[in-house]
Amino acid sequence: MTNENYTGVTTGTIATACSLAALESILDTSDIDCVKVKTPKKTLDIIIDECKRLSHSSACAVAHKNPYNDPDVTVGLAIVATVELLDKTSDGDSVIITGGEGVGKITKPGLQIPVGEYAINPVPRRMIRKNLERILPEDKVAKVTISIPEGRKIAKKTMNPKLGIVGGISVIGTTGIARSMSSEAYKNSIVTQIDVALALNLDNLVFVPGNIGEKLALKQLDITKQHIIQTGNYVGFMFEEAKKRGIDEFTFFGHIGKLIKIAGGIFNTKHAIADGRREIMITHAGICGADTKTLQKLYDSKTTEDMLDILDEENLHLDVCNSIALAIKERCMQRFDLDLNVILVDMEGNYLNDNFERFLL
């Protein structure tokens, strides 16, 4: 892998390595502390922390997803594969893959795996199958069970519960290699929310920036959690994906401190990429008649909430927030051809604009 500090391996690669090590230990009694795993990108050497035979025809292996430069909740997790070697009695699959403790189960449609199956995604399944078939005797079947002892606990920190994946985390990966701060991996996880909502035939979807927006939306709107789509910082990406899937209109709900960036054409709201909140607020305050003294106060403010207090003092709060909401709506129509119902709120969930449709209230 290039630039080792910035790449790691996926849970799918570790699961494959453990499966391969367990099978090798059944076929060869020598100690196994490293295996070569063929991924869609390249062959990787994966260290095995423990491997032991359970019987003449079964074994288990454990490996950890080693740290790399990424805030990944699965880093450091132990992944276990138990392999049982059976006599082949039919022309069916030679490698049977299932899940154990800590691997989630699919309970809702719209995902890559059918309802009722363990959340071991297609690429990891193929990796396990292809790597094991290289050394599997033709007259045998390998039954592989993947377990993640801490998976149930870690799952609470992921989007799995929202997506209907219960009881643990998912075994994922598309290339076998995890890249530092990989926007692709994160995007792949959040866009799944749209697929699940569409599979459930839900109308009146509500897009929010994150957990705070979701909490406030559930408090203020007549909707369920399933209607809510979190965009994270990737607002533009999520809107593009919604449009690709035939969604033309929805509600965009959230704290003005996040949503105001969209009024300025900033569709990735990560602070390090762009801010502009103060400048956008000042522009709309000026449009709505704020004098120079008020504009200077806004410029000197540290937070969006402080700016709202200043607008309140000048009785400009509603006009400015309506202007910002309209700008957000216009930006999204121009960029994505989306008709948004924009609702701006403060940290308490109080509505800041009133130029929105009220069908969800």
From Swiss-Prot:
<comment type="similarity">
    <text>Belongs to the CbiD family.</text>
</comment>
<dbReference type="GO" id="GO:0032259">
    <property type="term" value="P:methylation"/>
</dbReference>
<protein>
    <recommendedName>
        <fullName>Cobalt-precorrin-5B C(1)-methyltransferase</fullName>
        <ecNumber>2.1.1.195</ecNumber>
    </recommendedName>
</protein>
<keyword id="KW-0808">Transferase</keyword>
<keyword id="KW-0169">Cobalamin biosynthesis</keyword>
<dbReference type="InterPro" id="IPR002748">
    <property type="entry name" value="CbiD"/>
</dbReference>
<dbReference type="Pfam" id="PF01888">
    <property type="entry name" value="CbiD"/>
</dbReference>
<comment type="pathway">
    <text>Cofactor biosynthesis; adenosylcobalamin biosynthesis; cob(II)yrinate a,c-diamide from sirohydrochlorin (anaerobic route): step 6/10.</text>
</comment>
<dbReference type="InterPro" id="IPR036074">
    <property type="entry name" value="CbiD_sf"/>
</dbReference>
<keyword id="KW-0489">Methyltransferase</keyword>
<dbReference type="GO" id="GO:0043780">
    <property type="term" value="F:cobalt-precorrin-5B C1-methyltransferase activity"/>
</dbReference>
<dbReference type="GO" id="GO:0019251">
    <property type="term" value="P:anaerobic cobalamin biosynthetic process"/>
</dbReference>
<keyword id="KW-0949">S-adenosyl-L-methionine</keyword>
